[in-house]
Amino acid sequence: SEALEMQKVAHETGRILSIGVCNRFGTAVNHIKDLIDAGELGEVYHVYASFRANRSIPGIGGDFTRKSASGGGTLIDWGVHYLDLILYCCGEPKPLTASGEAFCKLGKNIKDYVYTGMWAENTADMDGVYDVDDSVTGIIRTDGPTISFNGAWAENIGESETYIDFIGDKAGIRHQYCGGFVLYSVKNGMLLRSEPKFRSKDFYEEEINSFVDCVITREHNRADIDLAIATSKIMQAIYDSSELHREVVID
């Protein structure tokens, strides 16, 4: 609801509102988008994302894990970036329905949480509040590909996973989040694997430069609220679905 209100005010005032979805400015991400747009993957019918860690709950007990302050856990902290990246690369498909489950398991007993390192540990409060999701799973139907994901700040798994699979009927891509990608294809009766090499630009710098251009030209960029709002709607639908234990229609 807050994102929708921001969008409403931006429209009413004629202001440009860009959201901090920095992956839209990443070099690898834009190469992937170009390949999809050019039809190199054929029909991209499914996309899968995995963003899971063994123990990565940030600032446990503090604002990160207090729903009244953060709005949510893994899905809002990590999932937002994966989902937005997917929508961008796939040409902004319209989300139709979502089904998901959000779990509050490994961190809810704060003093029993075992870890070896913690991001933002200086904000942790062992007598604080933990009422957000530390793992989440979901599936989204769109008017393009289906999207499924598994995410976790903390799960009892051996190794962290941070990748996205774009699955097409001609080829597929595995993108290592904030890294490069591998293209899997078929040609002349052969299964091919290629790992493109390229020089990457700093996506934060590209994001800032793009916004400066918006200020000068008054034109909206690829991170405009009207594009980024879809991810907020998906996340809300996943949380609603988890509470209702059923699929939810996305307006």
What are the residue ranges of the model-derived segments?
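Contiguous beta-strand/loop segments that form the cofactor/metal-binding neighborhood of enzyme cores
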Residues: D84-G180, E206-E219
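Residue-level signal for the nucleotide or nucleotide-sugar donor/cofactor binding architecture
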Residues: T27, D77, E161, E206, ...
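Predominantly a Rossmann-like dinucleotide-binding segment in NAD(P)-dependent oxidoreductases
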Residues: T13-I16, N23-G128, H245
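Short acidic, glycine-rich loop/turn motifs
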Residues: I140-G144, S185-M190
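Short catalytic-loop micro-motif centered on adjacent basic/acidic residues
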Residues: L17-G20, S148-N150
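A general structural signal for well-ordered alpha-helical segments in protein cores
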Residues: A3, A28-V29, Y82-L83, E205-N209, ...
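C-terminal "lid/loop" region of Rossmann-like NAD(P)-dependent oxidoreductases
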Residues: L191-S200
